């Protein structure tokens, strides 16, 4: 199969024109006027279309009425189908702070999806464990009674029983045993600072031990002050660490998003952090890790008004960022290659290059999705 006369983002995320040849689900060649046989299917992408890599969401709890912590294949299939329709071709189902039994069951359900992928859905490429090793003071929408101190032996059991599918684990490194956890867990997967009371110095100590990621930067952590830089300042200051950004316009002000993308560059990645209410009618109440949330004017809220995740998706966030003034190429890269890099899969997915999976999204002149190849 060939996509011909395509405007596409090349592996350096420059907009170029040419053909993309696909064979057996992988990109075989890219370039201008590629030779083709008569029997080859050719899709003409000439005009105002732009081909970009499939989106990669490494932090998503749920959507379409389903949640990772439902711990069933059916829930993950509902999520995968919804995500693919919105251009997400790879994702990490994300657990919350809940019981050990639920976390283990969720990991096993994700493993089943990886071993036996569904047709017509986004691909599960690992799991993100957000909790239970977080700070109660910064729990956000996480359930307090299930919060645990950092416990590497417990995490190792989760990791091994699930066949090593955990790609990201979050924690508050200032908690007792936190730095030891970071040092050991970082040998297995990406470790992220999250839901934390850490100050600048404590965050930097965690980075020195192996933290390379910050979960939903700005949210559930100490902010940037000119005399107390906090976790946000520590991330800005350290080139080893990347930051997730929820770009729905509610979690972070557009002006701050513009500044963050300028400061972080290739260390900024987009996540949805979406919940089961994503794609469902506003005003309905939904369970979120044992707590009830409702959606009002695009915001998902706990009864006390706390923002509880989002109801957005990476495609909408790209459109948001472009409207906020972030360059299109940078926004797409932050939703594709950079999240793939964060979980160590940038050699397989995340950009349009020979040898990578042929996960492609065709956007029209309004940045709406015209087609998804997966």
Stretches with model-predicted labels:
Residues 99-105, 174-176, 192-197, 246-262, ...:
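Active-site glycine- and acidic-residue-rich loops that bind
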Residues 181, 202-335, 341-348, 363-368:
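Active-site-adjacent C-terminal substructures of enzyme catalytic domains
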Residues 61, 77-106, 122-135, 162-174, ...:
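Divalent metal-dependent hydrolysis catalytic cores, especially in the metallo-beta-lactamase
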Residues 6, 341, 351-374:
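C-terminal cap of metal-dependent C-N hydrolases
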Residues 1-36, 372:
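N-terminal metal-binding scaffold of metallo-dependent hydrolase/deaminase domains
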Residues 62-71, 92-102, 220-236:
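Active-site loop-to-helix "anion-binding N-cap" substructures in soluble metabolic enzymes
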Residues 129, 136-230:
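Divalent metal-binding pocket/active-site signature
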